[in-house]
UniProtKB/Swiss-Prot annotation:
UniProt protein name: Gamma-glutamyl phosphate reductase
Enzyme Commission number(s) from the entry: 1.2.1.41
UniProt pathway annotation: Amino-acid biosynthesis; L-proline biosynthesis; L-glutamate 5-semialdehyde from L-glutamate: step 2/2
Catalytic reactions on record: L-glutamate 5-semialdehyde + phosphate + NADP(+) = L-glutamyl 5-phosphate + NADPH + H(+)
HAMAP family for the chain: ProA (MF_00412)
Designated gene of the protein: proA
Protein's organism: Corynebacterium melassecola
């Protein structure tokens, strides 16, 4: 072995040292970034958008290295799609930066307040969280999203992408840091963590006192590893095993269109429909129409073959238990027949990731029962699951879809990346 070759332990030690040094640098600039004015923040975001477009050739070249390595390592095409950047997607990322610049700055917003009987004026205001760690997989656009939303909400971004996107992420962060430097702000306002080993994730999520919150975004394995292993507070952006229940009183053509949209519009995202539940009270011809429409759209059907063949379906892949709780992220869908809305609710309760659940029905009482009883961050009544999206909600860009119940639930936009503090202003009052 060459004298310059590092052992695995030395690589980990160096990585740990780098993470803690970067975390310390991030923590040190929190007070200054927290009070940065709205005008400068917006100017930086717009300049960053222009710079990304101007240097798109550099980004695409770096991204090509990641895609080449991904294909060589057998990466699935659904993940290649998440990884890929071209001029159109870079324009979209730049547009996202400009959009965030146009959003209302949440920092300093007064949520409530009053004057106490003794004359003390009190108010609750929004304040940044501090150092915001992001751990995510093969989507380099998240790097820029994290920077934009962190900066606008007064936070410092500490990002750790997948090793599969290391060239893309390195180039994107370099460009963002160049823009920050132009505005005389620390390059540490956004930093990329090393990803030579998975140990850097553990270093990040246990950096209590340096990192204020960690938000994982990706597959179930990544999210569970972060949430269960962290000592730093986390916000869980869950996987999306989204169900669409078609009630016997649904408008069938409308329901079919919504299921196909939810499944095929972009199958590699977390709001894609992964399971279609068919009311047993639907006629055999209606059930068959749903299955055939999906197949004609290029979707592979997984289900209990005997159950689906009973109403005439063909070319069905026998489902295993795994199919019912899978986030396919591909042109695959699980299909099951259930006993009415309560059967749908029971199935969803067993397999849901509590992301988005949908119902198609013209019965108001059935719709209300579904909405009241299903446990999910978002409930769609006669609408595609694809609408679970911060931009669609009118919230602007989001950092992810939170499926937990504390701090934030659903699309996490700027207000969800803040906390609050109470400010009391008196004139010398003392408490008796």
């Amino acid at each position: 072995m060459s004298s310059t070759t590092l052992t695995d332990d030395q690589i980990r030690d160096n990585e740990r040292t780098e993470v803690l040094a970067k975390a310390t640098a991030a923590k040190n600039i929190v007070p200054d970034i927290a009070v940065l004015g709205t005008g400068p923040k917006n100017a930086i975001l717009r300049a960053a958008a222009d710079e990304l477009v101007a240097r798109s050739a550099e980004i695409i070249e770096a991204n090509a290295s990641d895609i080449e390595a991904g294909r060589a390592n057998g990466m699935e095409e659904s993940m290649i799609d998440r990884l890929a950047l071209d001029e159109s997607r870079i324009e979209g990322i730049a547009g996202g930066l400009r959009q965030v610049a146009g959003l209302t700055d949440p920092v300093g917003e007064v949520l409530r307040g009053h004057v106490m009987e003794n004359g003390i004026q009190m108010k609750q205001v929004r304040v940044p969280l501090g150092v915001m760690g992001m751990v995510y997989e093969a989507r380099p656009n998240v790097t820029v999203d994290a920077f934009a939303l962190a900066l606008k909400s007064g936070n410092v971004a500490f990002v750790r992408g997948s090793s599969t996107a290391v060239h893309s992420n390195t180039k994107l962060v370099e460009i963002l840091q160049d823009v920050l430097e132009r505005f005389e702000l620390p390059r540490e306002t956004v930093q990329l963590l090393p990803c030579q080993t998975r140990g850097s994730v553990q270093d990040l999520i246990t950096a209590r006192g340096l990192v204020d919150v960690v938000i994982p975004r990706g597959g179930a394995g990544l999210i569970n590893a972060v949430v269960t292993g962290a000592t730093v507070p986390t916000i869980e952006t869950g996987t999306g095993n989204c169900h669409f229940y078609i009630d016997a009183e649904a408008k069938l053509g409308q329901a079919i269109a919504m299921v196909i949209n939810g499944k095929t519009r972009r199958c590699s995202v977390c709001n894609a429909t992964e399971t279609a539940l068919l009311d047993a009270a639907l006629s055999d011809s209606d059930k068959l129409a749903v299955v055939q429409a999906l197949q004609e759209a290029g979707v592979t059907i997984h289900g209990r073959v005997a159950e689906l063949e009973a109403f005439g379906a063909t070319d069905v892949v026998e489902a295993t238990e795994t199919d019912w709780d899978s986030e396919y992220l591909s042109f695959d869908i699980a299909v099951a027949v259930v006993d009415g809305v309560d059967g749908a609710l029971a199935h969803i309760a067993k397999y849901s990731t509590k992301h988005t659940e949908a119902i198609a029905t013209q019965n108001i009482e059935t719709a209300q029962r579904f909405a009241d009883r299903v446990d999910a961050a978002a409930v769609m009544i006669n609408a595609s699951t694809a609408y679970t999206d911060g931009e669609q909600y009118g919230m602007g860009a989001e950092i992810g879809i939170s499926t937990q119940k504390l701090h934030a639930r659903g699309p996490m936009a700027l207000p969800e990346l803040t906390s609050t503090k109470w400010i009391l202003q008196g004139t010398g009052q003392i408490r008796p």
